[in-house]
Amino acid sequence: MTGLPARLNAANDTFSARLGYTFARPALLAQALTHRSHGAQHNERFEFIGDAVLNCVVAAALCERFPQMQEGELSRARAGLVNRDMLARLAQRIDIGAHLLLGEGELKSGGATRPSILADAMEAVFGAVFLDRGFDSARDVIVGVYGDILGEPAGAVLAK
């Protein structure tokens, strides 16, 4: 796949399979996986977009799955599903840390396993998918990455 650094290019097929998505514009994936410590074209703007798309997708999924829930319960459930810890767990599931481009200092200090960096990268990947092919593709990827977590009983979702 072109548009990716060699390190990402070699692992892209595996990462795409885990993500359940192949980028039409692989440079977006490269930027989504680039921490600000690594270069000027980093993932923070993608993270911003991914956060918004993620909140929308999870809110809609909760409303559909739990029509009996009140707004306060829905808000608490959404907060539990989009927080740093949950996003870091999802990032670990698809091994984002192995594909991150980090500056030397961040790499040496264990940045590839730091929950905040993993969570931010997960949001950035969601944002990159949205920029690559739009909302429907981003929704499909988010639902796929979350898997059965979005389908858990209401009590389990609220306990997160």
Positions of the model-derived regions?
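Double-stranded RNA-binding/processing signature
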Residues: M1-K160
